[in-house]
Amino acid sequence: MGLFKSLFGGNNTPETEKEKNDKKNFEILKYDGIRAQRMGKLPYAIKCFEEAVAINDELETLSLLATAYTQANRLDDARITLDRMATKDPEQVNTFLSLAGICYMQEDYENMKDACQKALVLDNKNPLSFYLTAKAAIGMKDDITAIAMLTKAIVLKEDYTEAYQLRAEVLWKMKQAKDAAEDIQKLLSLNPDDEQALLLKGEILAATNEPEQAQECFNQVLSLNPFNEKAYILSGELYLVNKDFDK
């Protein structure tokens, strides 16, 4: 039997040994990269992940590499890696959502929208896909579509605070004060100490001739966070408008 192995199977031995070494090296590089990433040593983590995917371009390690690139603000490299993941497995919703996030950071709203649409084709019940589509629409100056997408996100996730906040901001930009105020009230019912919501509520109240209530909102923000610069600015503007110079 040894003779047959030497005659017919001998050529497999070096390859088998190489596969074992590759697997071992891959695991070492991958988990060294994870440890380095957790310690904030991004250049070393990236190097480990790059060498690991050169051995085995599995999705998990590619995802780790894309995240490390993003953390290091190497957005082009992150995008290339995510495109590579999408080509390798085009059925992964999270890949397209991550790609949409990178496009948003690069202000590439057309490709962001495209990534979101691909995510929605795979899963049209994911509220994040609609939320990111709305952000792409805002970037493209399409507020009507943004409102529609945010509404769909909220239908799917009734406590989606970020979607309520963003929809309120868009509605207020469109001078729809009543509708914006309703979203803010819903948001504050979910989180009474939401600084962004309180500031927007104050802005709306100030613009609709409710200065005292507006100031209460700004004061509440400052009591929560004395370093909130926007609260000071809005409060100062309110004083100027109402000529309350003594304060």
Predicted region positions:
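Alpha-helical segment of the N-proximal tetratricopeptide repeat
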Residues: 21-60, 64-71, 101-107, 135, ...
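Short coil turns that delineate tetratricopeptide repeat
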Residues: 56-57, 90, 124, 158, ...
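Structural signature of tandem alpha-helical TPR/SEL1-like repeats
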Residues: 39-47, 72-84, 106-118, 139-152, ...
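Alpha-helical adaptor scaffolds
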Residues: 101, 169, 203-206
